[in-house]
UniProtKB/Swiss-Prot annotation:
The gene is alaS. It is found in: Cytoplasm. It catalyses: tRNA(Ala) + L-alanine + ATP = L-alanyl-tRNA(Ala) + AMP + diphosphate. It holds the Pfam family tRNA-synt_2c. GO terms for molecular function: alanine-tRNA ligase activity; aminoacyl-tRNA deacylase activity; ATP binding; tRNA binding; zinc ion binding. It comes from Vesicomyosocius okutanii subsp. Calyptogena okutanii (strain HA). Its cofactor is Zn(2+). This is Alanine--tRNA ligase. One of its GO terms (biological process) is negative regulation of DNA-templated transcription. HAMAP family: Ala_tRNA_synth_B. InterPro entries: aa-tRNA-synth_II/BPL/LPL (IPR045864), Ala-tRNA-lgiase_IIc (IPR002318), Ala-tRNA-ligase_IIc_anticod-bd (IPR018162), Ala-tRNA-synth_IIc_core (IPR018165), Ala-tRNA-synth_IIc_N (IPR018164), Ala-tRNA_ligase (IPR050058), Ala_tRNA_ligase_euk/bac (IPR023033), DHHA1_dom (IPR003156). Binds 1 zinc ion per subunit. SUPFAM superfamilies: Class II aaRS and biotin synthetases, Putative anticodon-binding domain of alanyl-tRNA synthetase (AlaRS), ThrRS/AlaRS common domain, Translation proteins. Belongs to the class-II aminoacyl-tRNA synthetase family. Zn(2+) binds at H556, H560, C660, H664.
Length: 865
C-alpha cells in the first residue's frame, strides 16, 4: 500500500465515523507564542480543547504537516543517525471535542489498524498511564487484548502535554513489534530504546488544562486527541525498518545519491543522504508557510536546517550549489496533497539558492579552522571558547560544530560555550532595556461592537480594572480600564489601532486613550477619569473621536489598495507579514526578497491613487469562508476564521477583495491622496512600506515643495532647473575629490621613499617600525606594499593616527614569512594600543584606540626580531 493510499484511507475511515475532514494548517501556529512550529496534529485545535474557540462540529480528522526542529520538541540532532526521526513529518489524527472519549477512541484505533490496514494483532503492543485503570479495562475486557502485552508506564511516557501549559491528559500508545530478529524490548522495559517495538499511534485523553503554576484544571468537557506519524505507519505497512526506504522518500533519496560524484560510492542508507532528504522537506514547507532564513526565531531554525543539509552535501563531495534543486522533486511528490508547494516553487528555490550561496564562504572558513583544531586535538571534548569563536567570529553554527565533532567521536564543551554566550548577552544587555508586561484581569463577558454603523452609543459598564484588579469604582485622576456591554469603539486587532474618545454622562467623564480586546472578546477602554466618580453598572455614552476614526479608516482602506497594487507590480507570491494602521500613517510588511526599484514604487503609488480618484463605493459582505474564497478574497495562510467572515471589496472589477474586521471609508475618494514615504528591509525576505494619506500626505508633499524651493534659492536656479544645477555641483565635487586623492597619493609615494632611510638593520634584517602622517589607512597599505618591493628581507610596521584612532599595517617580505608572521607582529602591537587585527603571513591590518601607547608599542617590535 502506497503512502498516498494510506493517507486517504485514514481520512475516509474517520469521515465514515462522522468526523469532519480539516485541511492541514500552516506550520506557523496561529495566535500562539508558546510554539515555534506546529509540532502535533492537535495544535490547530488548541483553543477548541481549552474552550476558548467553538467549531460547528464535535468530531474532526486531519493530516497535519508538522515540524520538530526547535523548542521543547526538537528532533533535529537525531535526524540522519536514526531510521525514524524527522524534522518534517505528517501526523494523522482524529479528535473529539466533548463528543466521544476513551472507549470510542480505543475501539476506532483498533478497528482501523486491524481491519482497515490488516495489521497482525499478534504484532501489536499497548501502553497505558499507570493510574489509568479505565483505559486498561477497555483494552482487556472490551477489545480482548492480552494483559501480558500491556505496559503500565509513568507520566514521563504516558501523560501527554503539548507545552509547559495548556491541554494535557493520560495517553495510551500502540506499538508495532518488528520481531525477535531486531534488538529492543517493549515499552516500560529496560531495553525499550531498541528498534524492535515502534510506537505508531498515541491516543491522548485530554482531561486537563495545565496552568502556569502547575495546577491541572479539569476541562469542562473531556476530549480526545490522537496522533499517528504517517511515515512510521507506512514503514510498518511496507515492511521496512527504515522510514527512508518507503515510497514517499525514495525519489528524493535517489536524487540526492545521483548528485554525488560517482567515485564516492554513496549508498542509499548513508546518514548524510537521510539528513538532506529530510531537511529539504522541512525547509521547503517552512518557506511555503512564510518563514525566511534569519538569525532569530523560526528564521534561525530554518537557517540551521538549510545549512545542516548543505554541510552534509559538501561532506559527500557535492561541490556545487545543489540543495535548491531538490525542491522541484519534492513539489512533484506532494502536488496532489499540498499543491501550494508547487505554486510557490519559484520562491522556495530562490530562497534556498540564495542561502546556500551565502553559506558557502562561511562553511569553507569554519571547516578549515575546525579541521585544524581537530587535527591537532588530543582530548575528547572541544573547548567551548573555540566553539564560541567559530560561532561568533565566523558565523559557524554550533549544531554543525557538534555534528562534525560527533562524527569524529568527539563532544563539544557546551557549558564553556554557554559561559561565553552569557558574557556576550551581558554585554548586549547593557545597551537594552525591556520590561515584561504583567498579566491583566480576564473578563468573561464579550463586548458587542456597534462601531461599523455609528460612532456613539449608550451602554452599561460591565467591569472596571484599576492597578490590575477588579474594582467597583474609580475617582478623578485614576487611571483605569473600563469594559462596556456594547461599544462603538474599535478594539485594536488585525493591525488596526484601537479608537480613542470619551465615555460620559451628566456626572462623569472618562477619557479613552486607546481600546484593546481580550481573548474572550471583552473590549478594554484604557484611559483616565477627568470628572466625577465612575462605578460598575453606570450607564455612559461612548463617543468615538470622529477625526481620529476617519484618519484610521483612510489608512486602512489605503492598506488594502496597496496590498492589491503590490500583487499587480511584484507578483502574486507577495504575502502579508504584518501591518500597523494608525491615525497618522500606515505600515505594511510583506514577503519580497529584494529591494523594490524606484520605478516599481512609483507604479504602485500611481495605481493606488488612480483607484482613489475613481471614487468607487466600498462594499461589505458577511458570508462564510468558502463563500469568501469563491469571491477571490485574499486570506492569510494559516489564520483561523470563524463561521462568518466580513469581506471588503474595493475598486472597479473587484480590484481588492479581502477578509477584514476593521473600519474603512465609504467611498475610495474619501482617502484623498496616497503617498509612499519609505521602503525598507525588516528582515531577510521581508520588506516594509510606510505611507501617508489625506491631509497628512498633502502636508508631506508641501514640506518637499518647500525644501525644493529652498534648494532652488541656494543654487540660484528655478524649480525646474534645480536638478540640473545640483547634478553639476556634484560633478564638480567629484572632480575636486579626485584631485585631492591624486595629491594624497603623491604625498604617500614621497613618504614611502623618505621612510626607506629610516629602516634599521637588526640581526641582518631590515626593520621599519614608525608613524607616518598625512595619509589614509588605504594609503598606509599601499606604502607597505611598495616598501616590501624596495626593501629586501624586511619587517615593516607602519601606523597613522586619525581622529584619535590608530590604523596599523604590518608587512613581511616573502623570504621571511616562515620566520616572522605579519599577523602575529600586528597583534603584538595592537594589544598594546587597545585593539586587534588580522591578515595573512605577509600582510596584516588592524587598529587601536590608545594612540598615547603607540610609540612604545612600535619600539617593542624590535624585541621580536
Amino acid at each position: 500500500m502506497k503512502t498516498a493510499q494510506i493517507r486517504q484511507k485514514f481520512l475516509d475511515y474517520f469521515e465514515s465515523k462522522g468526523h469532519i475532514i480539516e485541511s492541514s494548517a500552516s506550520l506557523i501556529p496561529h495566535n500562539d507564542k508558546t510554539l515555534l512550529f506546529v509540532n502535533a496534529g492537535m495544535v490547530p485545535f488548541k483553543d477548541v480543547f481549552s474552550g476558548i474557540e467553538k467549531r460547528p462540529y464535535t468530531r474532526a480528522v486531519s493530516v497535519q504537516r508538522c515540524a520538530r526542529a526547535g523548542g521543547k520538541h526538537n528532533d533535529l540532532e537525531n535526524v540522519g543517525y536514526t531510521a525514524r526521526h524527522h524534522t518534517f513529518f505528517e501526523m494523522l489524527g482524529n479528535f473529539s471535542f466533548g463528543d466521544y472519549f476513551k472507549r470510542e477512541a480505543i475501539h476506532y484505533a483498533w478497528e482501523f489498524l486491524t481491519k482497515e490496514l490488516n495489521l497482525p494483532k499478534k504484532n501489536l503492543w499497548v501502553s497505558v498511564f499507570d493510574q489509568d485503570n479505565e483505559a486498561e479495562d477497555i483494552w482487556v475486557n472490551e477489545i480482548g487484548f492480552p494483559k501480558n502485552r500491556i505496559s503500565r508506564c509513568g507520566a514521563k511516557d504516558n501523560f501527554w502535554q503539548m507545552g509547559d501549559t495548556g491541554p494535557c491528559g493520560p495517553s495510551s500508545e500502540i506499538f508495532y513489534d518488528h520481531g525477535e530478529h531486531i534488538a529492543g524490548g517493549p515499552p516500560g522495559h529496560a531495553n525499550e530504546d531498541g528498534d524492535r517495538y515502534i510506537e505508531i499511534w498515541n491516543l491522548v485523553f485530554t482531561e486537563f488544562d495545565k496552568q502556569e503554576d502547575g495546577y491541572l484544571k479539569p476541562l469542562a468537557v473531556p476530549c480526545v486527541d490522537t496522533g499517528m506519524g504517517l511515515e512510521r505507519l507506512v514503514a510498518v505497512l511496507q515492511h521496512k525498518n527504515n522510514n527512508y526506504d518507503t515510497d514517499g522518500f525514495q525519489n528524493l533519496v535517489k536524487a540526492v545519491v545521483n548528485l554525488t560524484p560517482k567515485f564516492n560510492n554513496i549508498k542509499d542508507n548513508n546518514a548524510s543522504v537521510r539528513v538532506i532528504t529530510d531537511h529539504i522537506r522541512s525547509a521547503a514547507f517552512m518557506i511555503v508557510d512564510g518563514v525566511i532564513p534569519s538569525n532569530e526565531g523560526r528564521g534561525y531554525v530554518l537557517r540551521r536546517i538549510i545549512r545542516r543539509g548543505i554541510r552534509h552535501g559538501h561532506k559527500m563531495g557535492i561541490g556545487k550549489v545543489f540543495f535548491y534543486r531538490l525542491a522541484s522533486i519534492l513539489a512533484l511528490e506532494f502536488k496532489d496533497v499540498y499543491p501550494e508547494l508547487e505554486q510557490a516553487l519559484s520562491k522556495v528555490e530562490k530562497v534556498l539558492k540564495r542561502e546556500e550561496q551565502r553559506f558557502s564562504k562561511t562553511l569553507d572558513q569554519g571547516m578549515s579552522i575546525l579541521e585544524e583544531v581537530i587535527t591537532n586535538f588530543k582530548g575528547s571534548e572541544i573547548n567551548g571558547k573555540i566553539v564560541f569563536k567559530l560561532y561568533d567570529t565566523y558565523g559557524f553554527p554550533v549544531d554543525l560544530t557538534s555534528d562534525i565533532a560527533r562524527e569524529r567521536n568527539l563532544t563539544i564543551d557546551m557549558s564553556g560555550f554557554e559561559v561565553e554566550m552569557t558574557k556576550q548577552r551581558d554585554r548586549a544587555r547593557q545597551a537594552s532595556d525591556f520590561k515584561i508586561s504583567e498579566k491583566g484581569v480576564d473578563i468573561a463577558e464579550r463586548t458587542e461592537f456597534l462601531g461599523y454603523k455609528q460612532l456613539k452609543n449608550v451602554s452599561l459598564i460591565q467591569a472596571i480594572i484599576n492597578n490590575n484588579e477588579l474594582v467597583e469604582k474609580i475617582e478623578v485622576g485614576d487611571h483605569g480600564i473600563v469594559v462596556l456591554a456594547q461599544s462603538s469603539f474599535y478594539a485594536e486587532s488585525g493591525g488596526q489601532i484601537g479608537d480613542k474618545g470619551i465615555l460620559s454622562n451628566m456626572q462623569v467623564e472618562f477619557r479613552v486613550d486607546h481600546t484593546n480586546k481580550q481573548k474572550s472578546g471583552a473590549f478594554e477602554h484604557h484611559g483616565v477619569l477627568n470628572k466625577g466618580v465612575l462605578k460598575v453598572s453606570d450607564a455612559v455614552q461612548a463617543n468615538v473621536d470622529k477625526k481620529s476614526r476617519k484618519c484610521i479608516a483612510r489608512n486602512h482602506s489605503a492598506t488594502h489598495l496597496l496590498h492589491a497594487a503590490l500583487h499587480i507590480v511584484l507578483g502574486k507570491a507577495v504575502m502579508q507579514k504584518g501591518s500597523l494602521v494608525g491615525s497618522e500613517k500606515l505600515r505594511f510588511d510583506f514577503s519580497y526578497d529584494k529591494v523594490i526599484v524606484k520605478s516599481d514604487l512609483e507604479r504602485i503609488e500611481s495605481i493606488v491613487n488612480r483607484k482613489i480618484l475613481g471614487n468607487t463605493k466600498v462594499y461589505t459582505d458577511i458570508t462564510n469562508i468558502e463563500g469568501a474564497k469563491k469571491k477571490g478574497a485574499m486570506t492569510l495562510f494559516g489564520k483561523k476564521y470563524g463561521d462568518t467572515v466580513r469581506v471588503l471589496t474595493m475598486g472597479k472589477n473587484e480590484f481588492s477583495v479581502e477578509l477584514c474586521g476593521g473600519t474603512h471609508v465609504n467611498q475610495l475618494g474619501d482617502i484623498g491622496l496616497f503617498r509612499i514615504i519609505s521602503e525598507s528591509s525588516v528582515s531577510a525576505g521581508v520588506r516594509r512600506i510606510e505611507a501617508l494619506t489625506g491631509y497628512d500626505a498633502y502636508q508631506f508633499d508641501n514640506r518637499i515643495q518647500n525644501s525644493l524651493n529652498k534648494i532652488a534659492q541656494m543654487t540660484r536656479s528655478s524649480n525646474t532647473e534645480v536638478v540640473g544645477k545640483v547634478t553639476q555641483l556634484i560633478k564638480q565635487q567629484k572632480e575636486l575629490e579626485k584631485q585631492i586623492a591624486t595629491f594624497q597619493k603623491k604625498i604617500a609615494n614621497n613618504q614611502g621613499d623618505d621612510l626607506i632611510v629610516q629602516a634599521q638593520e637588526v640581526k641582518g634584517i631590515k626593520l621599519l617600525s614608525t608613524v607616518v602622517e598625512g595619509v589614509t589607512s588605504k594609503d598606509l597599505r599601499n606604502i607597505v606594499d611598495k616598501l616590501k618591493d624596495k626593501l629586501s628581507s624586511a619587517v615593516i610596521v607602519l601606523a597613522v593616527v586619525i581622529n584619535d584612532k590608530v590604523s596599523l599595517v604590518t608587512g613581511v617580505t616573502k623570504d621571511l614569512t616562515k620566520q616572522y608572521q605579519a599577523r602575529k607582529i600586528l597583534n603584538h602591537v595592537a594589544k598594546q594600543i587597545g585593539g586587534k587585527g588580522d591578515g595573512r603571513s605577509d600582510m596584516a591590518q588592524g587598529g587601536g584606540t590608545k594612540p598615547e601607547c603607540l610609540i612604545k608599542a612600535l619600539a617593542s617590535v624590535k624585541s621580536l626580531i
